[in-house]
Amino acid sequence: MRIFTIKNTTAFLNYSMSLASSELILNADQSIYHLHLKPNEISNNIITVGDPDRVAEVSAHFDSIELKKQKREFVTHTGTYKNKRISVISTGIGTDNIDIVLNELDALVNIDFSHRVLKEKFTQLNIFRLGTSGAIQANIPVDSILISEKAIGLDALLHFYDANHLL
């Protein structure tokens, strides 16, 4: 049994308790519902992009591509780059879509789909966001490459996560 805290509430995870079909929604082929992916089809190193067309632009730089899948706006390519396995996936627009993608990626690596239970050892994914943004500073020219150290959301999504350590 694992104990963790979400927003001042202690939760107990029972690894032997099976997840209901409403808590883990799988397609007929046992892939996760929205992304249409199976656990072995993603890397632990994942680049997310908003625009589905940008997935092919990123994976064009891979040395090889082993998987190309699409369901709705969610496009995924998995392959290798400099001998490292990597996946790139589109999230679409908005925090609600990003939330779906992140939750389903987490399920892919931390839930045993065949028994519908949590794995005893959790896997942490390395997720990188690659995208475009406008700038309000006049000294930043169009087409500049920027690396953000922090970001802030003005929506309510973070209220559902234990994010106090981020602030």
Annotated model-derived regions:
Residues Y15-L167:
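Metabolite-binding pocket within alpha/beta catalytic cores that recognizes anionic/polar moieties
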Residues M1-S16:
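N-terminal amphipathic/basic-hydrophobic helices that include classical n-h-c signal peptides
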